[in-house]
């Protein structure tokens, strides 16, 4: 894909069921249950449009239940929805009438939970800002959408900061936020101290660019809740209590950013609202609920083989199974330069491919035959010219390796949408991606649509504006900072029970070998404790695709009793659910095979072989009473 850009501001009905909500990853309509979130949409918005699917996909990837509902259904006094919270999305729900605004106030004040995103309900039905400020200002706890006062400057791009505790709470990985001084200048990433100064601020950073400004509404007044993020002058995100209910206000265009390959904040706030604020269970994104990393190696020139040998001699490739990608042609910068690996004819390159396969690594395709030429010339409209290089690279690797190539990485990160579609048509299930940085495996949305229906993107982790070890070396990042970042992202995946991708080239790793060894030793220790794993892109992509066929239900079977019921057409093996211990306890397997463990404030239920599972829990206070409060609040 092209380099990331900074973003400037731009201006159901269902019968009431007593208990159950059956969740379907493909978005099939079903009755909402007590662990469900509702995405509130205007009647004119079709729930199958890409902008809506983007929200539903994000929730599904996070293992959450999110169901669209239209305004008329929400307002219908004969309707009843057993759901834990309502989300007002940006872009999709800018306009609202006073009746809906009043119902939202009643819903929250009677015990409902509401997430208000950016410009949701800031317009009247004529597409204009109402006089004064947003009609939801009193609900979210701060005045905003102040068009009468600021006109064309109602929204402004600004640097967004938070404390280290807030960044951790909303699930931002280390390196996607870095320290910032009082003048807004980004410092190098550093390990956060256990007792961080309350005044210390951390700002979001993007790969290659570093500093990024996000569009915000100017806000006025003191916020009486908990501030999560802010700019120098305005509230960016915070949550508060309003009578019996709670409101999370995110003054950032989450959907807009996600549609432009910056989906980290959308995913993070969905998870924060559902799990941290509401205590909802979720389907974990990694096998057995064990977090880990994909270590993606890019080998693109014959000069890579010398550092590759040094790393191999030091036992690096005996530490875990990695995703190792090769550019297969004989040239690198221009045709005839003979700097390439020449996979089809070079015996040394072939030896390394078989060496890595023997250690359990997955061999992938790194672009199209001639690394630098391909990466620098590839464009959105040149499929006819460059498709042959993708074919040649993939075919050469399959001939030499004797295995099917199922993963891909783009030279210099250049990933036009047509390449993604070609990859999916040709059996690739996963690809490295420089957009959506900081996320786990995801489906990419660009220009108002999803790139391809089934293939999984694996966004990179980065440390400020650097991602690969050689970039950190070129920028003279202190070795101690590189080491601390590697350890911190490993801890992040363990704590989040999630997977992320780190990438590098052999010559970058060779320069920082001492740091690399310390990191691998640390990962080894965590792996022996059963808390960490190395994954390949293909392995996770296949797991996540299988996970999409899981159907699961949360039933309140009696006061203080909740049952998880799950099915899969083939097997539930390795699927894992997380239930917050503050809300649930006393898990007991009633049907099927599963193991139960308590860890990091969660009850993890991991399914064994079998197509059906039933697990009973005791439900603590809020879970037992939240459904009637939240669903009947507006009545």
Question: What residue ranges belong to the model's regions?
Answer:
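Extracellular ligand-binding/catalytic regions of CAZymes and related secreted enzymes
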Residues: 23-33, 222-225, 233-235, 240-297, ...
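Helical hinge/lid and interdomain linker segments adjacent to catalytic or ligand-binding clefts
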Residues: 47-130, 324
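A glycine-rich, often tryptophan-bearing local segment used as a flexible ligand/cofactor-contacting loop or short
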Residues: 94-187
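C-terminal beta-strand-rich structural cap/linker in extracellular carbohydrate-active enzymes
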Residues: 98, 599-634
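Metal-dependent polysaccharide deacetylase catalytic core of the NodB/CE4 family, i.e.
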Residues: 122-123, 135, 143-161, 316-419, ...
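Catalytic beta-strand/loop cores that center a nucleophilic Ser/Cys/Thr
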Residues: 150-243
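Catalytic grooves of carbohydrate-active enzymes
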Residues: 292-300, 461-539
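Surface beta-strand/loop "capping" patches
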Residues: 538-582
